[in-house]
A protein has these predicted regions:
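Active-site phosphate/pyrophosphate- and oxyanion-stabilizing loops and adjacent acidic/basic residues
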Residues: 132
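N-terminal phosphate-binding loop and adjacent alpha-helix
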Residues: 44-83, 115-120
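ATP-dependent carbohydrate kinase catalytic cores
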Residues: 136-176
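Acidic, Ala/Val/Gly-enriched low-complexity intrinsically disordered segments
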Residues: 9-12
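Short glycine-rich, Thr/Ser-proximal phosphate-binding strand/loop in the N-terminal lobe
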Residues: 17, 21-62
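Short beta-strand-loop/turn "lid" adjacent to the catalytic site in phosphate-handling enzymes
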Residues: 75-123, 149-164
Length: 176
């Protein structure tokens, strides 16, 4: 199953002629957040989370509301109105294998991340979830790119030499 990959920048509403993007990269002990205006980095923040706080959550998905509030508090402290952000981009994890590149996050991508279809319970999947929830809340677009489950094998590369047995790719392209 492939997700929608192509989109036009014209589809993404801009505020004051600026294309503002909030990038969300959840990790095991922190959430990295960057704000861009066009191609210029406005700021990058690493929001650390105490282990004692994270251990209170029985499942990675349960951290989503907590991390959402931490991000909103940081944006408020930086004087950034989330409504002025044109697009939310989240690190991808937990979804179907897919080609590298930019992918529009929709309800299907969100649901797949929640389910952890790739077998992952890493906080990376919260990136898609947070981007989608922010996009819904503020009426914007959500994207992800270069999933932790990239598959760009051609049909020939899938052959194993054993009838009915095929290779599949599960490559974290950002770790190459």
């Amino acid at each position: 199953m492939w997700y929608t990959i192509r989109f036009s920048v014209k589809e993404v509403e801009m505020k004051d002629g600026r294309f503002r993007i909030l990038v969300i990269n959840p990790g095991s002990t922190s959430t990295k957040v960057s704000l861009f205006e066009d191609e210029t980095s406005v700021f990058e923040r690493k929001l650390f989370h105490e282990a004692s706080v994270l251990l209170k959550f029985s499942h990675v998905n349960d951290q989503m509301p907590f991390r959402r509030e931490v991000i909103l508090d940081m944006l408020k402290a930086e004087g950034v109105d989330p409504d002025t952000i044109a697009a939310f981009v989240g690190r991808c994890g937990g979804t179907h294998s897919q080609p590298s590149g930019v992918i529009r996050v929709d309800q299907n991508v969100y649901d797949d991340a929640v389910k952890g279809l790739d077998g992952s319970e890493h906080p990376a999947k919260l990136g898609v979830m947070l981007a989608w929830k922010f996009a819904e809340e503020f009426g914007k677009s959500a994207f992800t790119l270069n999933s932790t489950t990239v598959d760009e094998l051609n049909d020939y590369a899938r052959l194993t030499g054993i009838k009915g047995v095929y290779r599949f790719a599960h490559t974290h392209c950002l770790n190459q």
